[in-house]
Amino acid sequence: MRVSLVFLSFLFYFWANISAAIEEPSYKVISANKIYEVREYEDRIAVQTIQNNGQNGAFMKLFKYISGSNTSSTKIDMTAPVTQSVQIDMTVPVTQKFQDGEMVMQFFLPSKLKLEQAPQPLSEDLSIVVVKGGKYAVIKYTGRSTFRNFEKHSETLIEVLSLDKLKTVGPPIKATFDGPLTPFFLRRNEVMIRVE
């Protein structure tokens, strides 16, 4: 029993130090309430791919890029969150289900890298993009990063934003901050929706 407690303590210590070392995008909180907050982000650089062979395939393509599979063979620090969103025609209502349209997964590059400094991907499935800054309504939740959990919190956020008369201008974005080795009850996830 004592060995188990020591091992668990070590795991939590290790997890806390790893999580603290990962860069996250900076933002300014514009407003907050008990359910969500509105944040303002600057432009960010990301590498992205279309998820045509599942979530794990997309993740591995992006992970290979930051591990050195790029034109300069440069290893790039992992950042958080990893985001997933649906790429839709903006004439379609943004309340459509998450699985309609093509799924896009993004890794944000460290803030020290500018667009012209980002090494180009070797894979044609990847592209370097500028994610425009702006205001996002964000709801935080813990637990597994499942579609069901994401959809539940997306629906809550969309409903509350409608009640608060905040106009959304894009689909819900799933933001995952922790890896699969993090205990599910300690995992941090967010739903982000761009607002006017």
What are these regions (language model features)?
Residues 2-196:
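A solvent-exposed interaction/effector surface
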